[in-house]
Amino acid sequence: GVKATLDHCTDGELISDELAKEGLPVFVGPTLGSKSKAELRHKSFTTPGALYHAGLTVSIITDAPVIPLEKLPMCAGLAANAGLPMEEAWRAITINPARSLGIDSRVGSLEPGKDADLVLWTADPLTTIGAEAYCTIVDGKVVYQAE
């Protein structure tokens, strides 16, 4: 069968009880930016936390290139600041989207046999706006190293 997800879900907080009955994984975003369309008028960084507390598997998205991908950690941090537990904020940008898309056997967490992709930061990128990547590893090989 078809494995469905609910994408964008920017105002899903308003119907979190109904969404919980369906149990579909939700992808929330883009939340950063203006409320330029009618369907965005209720968007808020409280939505990921509300959906998580309703029992849903939450992923956070930027809808890149609408909001640049490098803003993803900041979006997760803002969701944590608005009620999503910090550990769940990390899951919302790592293992949750991988599981929801059925690719968690390869990516989403650091485990033997999975792709060895990793970014090392100067500080926690979810809580520190000035955090910078100082080392990036792809397939187990260093592809970027800050000077």
Explain the meaning of each model-derived region.
Residues K3-G12, T31, K35-K37:
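Catalytic beta/alpha-barrel core
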Residues D17-P25, G29-G33, K37-A123, T127:
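His/Asp/Glu-enriched, well-ordered alpha-helical/loop segment
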Residues T136:
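Short aromatic-centered micro-motifs
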Residues A146-E147:
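Short, solvent-exposed mixed-charge patches
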